[in-house]
């Protein structure tokens, strides 16, 4: 499964449902990251966001989401997904947290800018599911 434009074609207004606060928070993080990462990495991140949203809709990712993408220039994202740029391995691991972090550009801060959005607890009847998908390109 390679993240291509065809595989993750957007339908305006339907990708992130308004009734899901977790998906809304995820959309915020994705758009924020896309303002920093462009080109291939930006496309991959957007694809990962769509996968995460689908898992939320299916009830697989239960109460919260985590985004994590490593990049040489930024230590940005973790979306409960880690993308290794050298081996081009896509790992998808459901987590129950939503966390987004970007390094501060202000050296006086001496820390990192961290943003997190809480999600409501979902039904306790949903099974605790954790999936991991590993795909290698080429």
UniProtKB/Swiss-Prot annotation:
Q: Which UniProt keywords apply?
A: Membrane, Transmembrane, Transmembrane helix
Under the cellular component aspect of Gene Ontology, which terms does the record hold?
A: membrane
Q: Where are the residues of the annotated region Disordered?
A: 109-138
Tell me where in or outside the cell this protein is found. Answer: Membrane
Per UniProt, what is the membrane topology? Multi-pass membrane protein
Q: Which organism is it from?
A: Homo sapiens (Human)
Full protein name? Putative protein encoded by LINC02912
- Please give the chief subcellular localization of this protein: membrane
Task: Report TM segments.
Answer: 32-52, 65-85
Give the superkingdom in one word.
Eukaryota
